[in-house]
Swiss-Prot record:
The keyword Mitochondrion does not apply. Keywords: Cell membrane, Glycoprotein, Membrane, Transmembrane, Transmembrane helix, Transport. This is MFS-type transporter cnsL. It is a multi-pass membrane protein. GO terms for molecular function: transmembrane transporter activity.
């Protein structure tokens, strides 16, 4: 075999992937027991040129997939951020005065969007398994109901664990504050009959509606239904994913996987970490411009000074994700250590006097590196969950953690503490410490699980379980990212 050929048994390209058990299940009529990818393995395995493809062929295929998926997902996630940060941009243009909002009412406006997610997350998660992913995704772009959960599911369908951190850092970006700051700055020169804050919401709403239509026609539901891929390319995509033991998709809802997800200690540790990391996000998203204007800057200056946090979050997220992508053994340690940076920023904001404008701004900007550990943590649980129903359950549960943190965040910023917002700063410090402990504990649990499995596993075990829609606990060949 040529040196530039890879097989489905090569490392690190895949491990043994025969899918014999899954193919036998299909032939026996037990389709509900397998991942939908097993069907294409069964249909096309005999048509392939052996089980080989070149490194260059794989590289070109990934590049094509990137160009089809990443830009669309990037725009969707950015618009989701614009939708949530628009309230902060509107705050510098008298939305509180025009609507006669008290400090508490403004805080609840920042929390309110996430209550919808909490109420409808269960039904929406069930729908995500039962209906095609992309029409459902497009609908949620229109409603912004569970976009992040949908994005996470799409990424996990297409990419291997070592490829996910880089894509997550680009897709789940924080460019929204940059765009919102620029839009707010431009709107600041508007002299028309409408209030300036209304113009901001009109622009964001119009972009959202257009994007939902584009998503419906551009994104494929899954690799098997991707019209831009040939049968051979679909086969390669599926075989690349096979070694991860995480599957692609199954339309059968399995209640036993729901219970496994709920009673898994790892679920709760990640839940705590996500909720803790999102408390600062909820507060800063709603009060960012008020914090800056409280330092003595006018509306136009505040709009411009609100742009760097987006760059800090995005660049730190990309940098940390690229570092995390180099290993599957130390990702939780990398995430934990990275939380020290936003923790330092929070301490600066708390300790420095308000008269130290430069120090306060530096502390605020450093605070925004909190997005890096969060987006990297997403790639950790993406890689560590198998079984389609379990994935859906956990993604829904983690969205609830995300929403809970974002609901609590604005409530820690009290109007009677303005412009210092001491309660909000102290809450961020506490949450960062809690997140560090939860992520460390998660890494330890995963490490101990891997050690226990290594004592019993045989090489053939993983191959026998390909595409059987098993969970990470059921498949003893599954190895957790730590």
């Amino acid at each position: 075999m040529a040196a530039d050929q890879v097989t489905i048994s090569d490392e690190p390209k895949g491990g043994g992937v025969t899918a014999d058990a899954a193919v036998k299940a299909i032939k026996a009529g037990r389709n509900k027991d397998v991942d939908i990818a097993a069907q294409i393995v069964s249909d096309y395995a005999d048509q392939m040129d052996g089980d080989t493809w070149s490194v260059e062929e794989e590289r070109k295929l990934i590049r094509r997939i990137d160009w089809r998926l990443i830009p669309t997902l990037f725009v969707c996630a950015t618009l989701s951020g614009l939708d949530k940060t628009a309230i902060s941009a509107a705050a510098v243009y008298n939305i509180k005065t025009d609507l006669n909002l008290t400090g508490a009412e403004y805080s609840w406006i920042g929390s309110a969007p996430f209550f919808g997610g909490l109420l409808f997350m269960g039904p929406l998660a069930y729908c995500l398994q039962r209906v095609p992913a992309v029409p459902f995704f497009a609908f949620n772009v229109l409603c912004w109901g569970i976009l992040e959960m949908s994005v996470t599911m799409v990424v996990s369908m297409w990419y291997r664990p070592e490829e996910q951190p880089k894509r997550n850092s680009i897709i789940l970006n924080v460019v929204a504050p940059i765009i919102n700051g620029f839009v707010a700055w431009v709107v600041g020169y508007y002299k028309g009959p409408y209030e300036r804050w209304k113009i901001i919401f009109l622009l964001v709403g119009a972009l959202t509606i257009v994007t939902s239509v584009v998503v419906y026609f551009v994104l494929p539901n899954n690799p098997l239904e991707a019209k831009f891929l040939t049968p051979r390319e679909k086969y390669i995509v599926i075989q690349r994913k096979a070694a991860d033991n995480t599957g692609i998709e199954s339309k059968t809802f399995k209640m036993e996987q729901v219970w496994e997800a709920i009673f898994d200690i790892k679920t709760w540790l990640i839940w705590i970490a996500i909720a803790a990391l999102q408390v600062p996000n909820g507060g800063l998203t709603t009060f960012n411009t008020l914090i800056i204007s409280g330092l003595g800057f006018d509306s136009l200056q505040t709009s411009l000074l609100a742009m760097p946090p987006g760059a800090m979050s995005t660049l730190s997220g990309i940098g940390l994700s690229y570092l995390a992508a180099t290993t599957r053994r130390y990702r939780t340690a990398i995430v934990t250590v990275s939380i020290l940076l936003p923790l330092f920023g929070a301490v600066l904001c708390y300790a420095l006097p308000r008269t130290n404008l430069a120090g306060q701004l530096v502390g605020l900007y450093i605070l925004y590196t909190y997005w890096a550990p969060y987006v990297t943590l997403v790639s950790v649980y993406q890689a560590n969950v198998a079984g389609h129903t379990k994935k859906i359950t956990l993604y829904a549960w983690f969205y609830i953690a995300w929403a809970t943190g974002n609901i609590i965040g604005p409530q820690t910023f009290r109007a009677d503490q303005a412009p210092e917002y001491t309660g909000g700063t102290v809450a961020m410090i506490i949450c960062y410490v809690v997140a560090m402990f939860a992520i460390t504990a998660y890494g330890v649990v995963c490490h101990l699980s891997n050690k226990k499995r290594a004592e019993a596993i045989e090489a053939r075990t993983a191959a026998d379980h390909d595409w059987l829609d098993m969970t990470d606990k059921e498949n003893v060949g599954f190895k957790y990212t730590t």
